């Protein structure tokens, strides 16, 4: 008798089946990668929001220690040609002593002055590392970046600081002043905790600069704020009463015209 053995024939993937699997994996990757990227974007927006809460709280604590309840406001130098007649004077310029004043109220990390959704912190810290051979890790380092690398007498922070501050010297002018500048609203930005506008006018907002719609208050094109996929999605603003608002792109409005007569505006 001849014995026969039944063998199970194992069948592998055909070429067509393999191509179908690869195509399905490609589709899944195409769906998952944008979702993961958007998740990272939202996480960074949350980090920015938390940073603004800490900055607003530090400003409130500073005002609590001030005899007149004044919010952080340090003079800007007037000997710079950039400040003549408010030309090239912007709300992201602050007096350098403000950095140390806010440090004593909890803002001890230099990256707190930079938006986590933009590259300015990475660029500036890389420049500092190349110059001094060490990371930019302290507020003193941040001040050194402005004075020794940028050769500046004031700080260029990665946000707009709206608390009015005096210009140095005998002048009584302050910046920003809603009564002297082309602004959308006539109400002043708060300078003290008892001002009526502490819950309606922000003391800080995301850096955003662009052109305005001629028929309205929204922007047509802009840079800054929180962008994803090549489009601005939202921007944060923080208030002296402690709350932070995240404005969608469709709800943003211009607040300050940078140079009179030009289509260049700051939005939040």
Where are these regions (language model features)?
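N-terminal single-pass transmembrane signal-anchor helix
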Residues: 9-40
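N-terminal secretory signal peptides that target proteins for export/translocation
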Residues: 1-8
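Juxtamembrane interface helices immediately C-terminal to a transmembrane segment
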Residues: 31, 40-51
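Short, well-structured segments within or immediately adjacent to enzyme catalytic domains
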Residues: 46-268
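Acidic/polar helix N-cap motif
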Residues: 8-9, 51
């Amino acid at each position: 008798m001849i014995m026969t053995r039944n063998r199970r024939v194992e069948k592998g993937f055909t070429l067509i089946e393999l191509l179908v699997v690869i195509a399905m994996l490609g589709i899944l990757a195409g769906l998952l990668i944008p979702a993961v990227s958007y998740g990272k974007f939202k996480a960074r927006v949350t980090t920015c929001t938390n940073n603004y809460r800490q900055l607003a709280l530090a400003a409130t604590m500073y005002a609590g220690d001030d005899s007149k309840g004044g919010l952080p406001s340090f003079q800007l130098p007037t000997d710079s040609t950039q400040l003549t007649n408010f030309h090239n004077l912007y709300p992201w310029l602050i007096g350098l002593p403000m950095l140390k004043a806010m440090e004593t109220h909890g803002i001890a990390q230099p990256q707190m002055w930079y938006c986590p959704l933009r590259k300015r912190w990475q660029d500036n810290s890389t420049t500092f590392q190349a110059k001094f051979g060490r990371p930019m890790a302290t507020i003193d380092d941040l001040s050194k970046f402005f004075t020794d690398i940028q050769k500046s007498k004031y700080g260029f922070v990665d946000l707009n600081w709206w608390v009015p501050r005096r210009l140095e010297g005998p002048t009584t002018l302050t910046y920003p002043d809603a009564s002297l500048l082309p602004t959308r609203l006539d109400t002043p930005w708060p300078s003290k905790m008892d001002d009526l506008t502490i819950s309606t006018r922000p003391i800080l907002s995301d850096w955003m600069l662009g052109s305005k719609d001629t028929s309205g208050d929204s922007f047509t094109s802009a840079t800054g704020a929180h962008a994803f996929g090549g489009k601005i999605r939202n921007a944060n603003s923080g208030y002296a009463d402690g709350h932070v608002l995240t404005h969608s792109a469709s709800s943003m409005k211009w607040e300050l015209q940078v140079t009179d007569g030009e289509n260049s505006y700051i939005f939040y």
